A protein has these predicted regions:
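Short cytosolic juxtamembrane segments of multi-pass membrane proteins
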Residues: 252-257
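Short, membrane-interfacial amphipathic segments enriched in basic
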Residues: 1-15, 206
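Secretory targeting signals
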Residues: 2-7, 26-27, 31-80, 104-178, ...
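Short loop-to-helix capping motifs
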Residues: 24-25, 98-100, 179-181
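Amphipathic cytosolic juxtamembrane alpha-helices at the membrane-cytosol interface
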Residues: 97-109, 187
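Helix-capping/transition residues at the boundaries of transmembrane alpha-helices
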Residues: 20, 82, 93-95, 171, ...
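Transmembrane helix boundary and interhelical loop/hinge segments in multi-pass membrane proteins
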Residues: 77-95, 100-101
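Transmembrane helix segments
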Residues: 43-48, 178-216
Length: 257
């Protein structure tokens, strides 16, 4: 297929994938749970902060909420990718769009758009809560919304999207490999929440080299012991490592069965 045909097929596939997110139940559950947890996390963080404390800033609550957003994105991406095999819809999709490359472009584009929307939603909600709570603690956060500080704040939001999307791509790769939503989600959560935590606790020196830790640090524009370049480079490396076998299996597997 020509590049022009692939682009057109990819655009059509993206539009088709986006239509899957229009279900009211899905939107209410995702945005509702994310909104409630963001409110609780940011509100709790500010309730424990001392008055006139310098440890709280405009993006502190956003950084805390990013952990749940990343896990949620991983689960959504893994589920929406693997269910194409479980429900047998991949075969029907490839009949209309024979190019598997175009299908992956559509899947990745749609999930990226959803992740961007969820990141902006979390950022705006956490910012609104922080601005409201800061007044009660005698902290002025409005300078963070002016001049160069605003650009820094927006860059922080962009990094939040990049780190969250890294977890999303990790979920997509697991979905392609496992071909089962339950298995893909279980593997993602097992590695991210249990195995990495155990490895980081038992061997602190390797903590800064683990994939999920770098994804999360990238989302927070770098963290203690994690430079931004370090997080960005390792995140790209780990995504390449997990994506190559996933793409190979997706290309070679027979989807007619």
């Amino acid at each position: 297929m020509s590049s022009r045909t692939i682009c057109k097929s990819g655009f059509d596939a993206t539009r088709g994938e986006l239509l899957k997110f229009r279900r009211l139940g899905f939107l209410l559950s995702v945005f509702g749970s994310l909104g409630v947890l963001t409110l609780l996390i940011v509100g709790f963080a500010w309730s424990r902060a001392e008055k006139h404390s310098s440890s709280m800033n405009l993006t502190t609550g956003f950084d805390m909420a990013l952990f749940f957003l990343g896990i949620l994105t991983l689960c959504i991406c893994a589920s929406y990718t693997a269910q194409e095999y479980t429900y047998g819809t991949l075969r029907n999709v490839l009949v209309r769009t024979p190019s598997r490359q175009a299908f992956l472009i559509g899947k990745l584009s749609a999930l990226s758009a959803l992740t961007l929307l969820l990141t902006l939603y979390t950022f705006l909600l956490s910012t609104a809560i922080s601005l409201f709570m800061s007044g009660r603690h005698g902290i002025n956060l409005t300078p963070s919304l002016e001049g160069k500080a605003l650009l820094t704040t927006l860059a922080h939001c962009l990094n939040g999207f990049l780190g969250t999307m890294a977890l999303g791509i990790f979920g997509i790769a697991l979905g392609l490999i496992a071909r089962s939503p339950i298995i893909a989600i279980s593997l993602g959560l097992l590695w991210s929440l249990i195995i990495e935590s155990a490895l980081g606790g038992a061997l602190p020196r390797i903590g800064r080299w683990l994939p999920t830790a770098n994804f999360e640090s990238l989302a927070q524009s770098g963290a203690t012991g994690f430079s931004y370049i370090h997080c960005l480079s390792l995140s790209a490396f780990y995504l390449l490592v997990i994506s190559l076998p996933a793409l190979y299996l997706f290309k070679q597997r027979d989807v007619s069965q």
